[in-house]
Structures are given as C-alpha cells and as structure tokens.
A protein has these predicted regions:
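Short gly/ser/thr-rich secondary-structure transition/capping motifs
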Residues: 25-27, 46-52, 121-124
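Short secondary-structure boundary/capping segments
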Residues: 32, 37, 56-59, 133-134
C-alpha cells in the first residue's frame, strides 16, 4: 500500500502531462463556432473615428460580407492587413472591421500608416460584441451571408492560401445561392 501511495502523485502528474501534450498538438483554428448557420449577434456600435455615425449588424446583411475582428496592438493583424487591402482594392467582397478593445488614436495611426480596407469599422471598445461573437483572439474573420447568418469563422490571419482555398470558394458558393 505504501508503494502505491508514493507512486500515485507521479502517475497523476504523468497523466496530466500526456493530456496537455495531446492538446498542444491540436490546431485551435479548427474549432467550430457555435454561431455557424445562426444569425450574426445584433450590435450597434459607434464607427471608429467618425463622430455620430453608427455601425450595425443589419448593415452586414443583404449581400455576402466579411467581418474582420482586429486591433492595432495585434501583430497577426498587421501580418494579414496586406491581404485585406488587396481584397478591398480588387473589390472581391465588402469588408467590415470590428476594432476590438483598441485605443482610438492608436487605431487612427495604424490605419493611416497601413491603409484602410474596410467599408466601415465598428468600435468595440468594451469588447462586449467580441464576446457575443465568441472571439478568442485577433484576428478572426466571419463570413456573413445575405440573410445575416454566420456561415464561416476563420481563426487567425487570412493569407493568400486561406483566401484562395477556403474563403473565396465559400463566398462564390454563397453568392450563387438565391
């Protein structure tokens, strides 16, 4: 009995190490959002940098749109930004931004330096809308269909590969639906 009592903490520790080691091998971007095929959570937020203007969830329905959650303090957001600029310039899709817990002056400087690909940017200063969306970190991008339903959630930055092989085919399919 004494020998087992001495080995029990070691066995528990090894079990926990194995459990967490397996978890580290999983790709968090493969986690499905509970919002898929459900309406985009309603929001009505001030437009970043534009006094008196509001950005609402209703603006994202009626056509297929992208909602990109980003922040000026987010390094991965800076990495994906050139791809978003390219999409906006080519008019591939209407792109809306959700500035997540950002400081207005830092956001303004970031957009001045890097360019603004967004049709409008909602200022989620408190992070409440991001919580409603289930955001776990920036950047995250949502494809919203004509009916205002979330059809896909991209966790992490959009690069050319993700655009060409995941997002663009889904958007083309959604735009073809009547």
């Amino acid at each position: 009995m004494n020998r087992f009592a001495l080995l029990l903490p070691l066995l528990l520790f090894l079990g926990l190490v194995a459990y967490f080691a397996v978890g580290l091998t999983r790709d968090p971007s493969l986690i499905q959002s509970v919002l898929i095929d459900k309406p985009l959570p309603a929001f009505d937020l001030p437009a970043a940098g534009v006094d008196g203007v509001r950005v609402t969830s209703a603006q994202l329905s009626g056509r297929v749109t992208l909602l990109n959650v980003f922040a000026s303090w987010c390094i991965a957001c800076k990495v994906e930004h050139p791809v978003l600029l390219k999409l906006a310039k080519a008019k591939k899709i209407e792109l809306y931004g959700l500035a997540w817990k950002d400081k207005p002056e830092e956001l303004k400087n970031w957009l001045s330096e890097l360019g603004n690909p967004y049709a409008a940017i909602a200022d989620d200063a408190t992070g409440r809308t991001a919580i409603d969306l289930g955001v776990t970190g920036a950047p995250e991008t949502y494809i919203i269909d004509r009916k205002g339903q979330v059809r896909y959630k991209q966790i992490g930055p959009i690069d050319d590969y993700v655009w060409e092989n995941t997002l663009q085919p889904l958007i083309a399919r959604l735009e073809a639906e009547q």
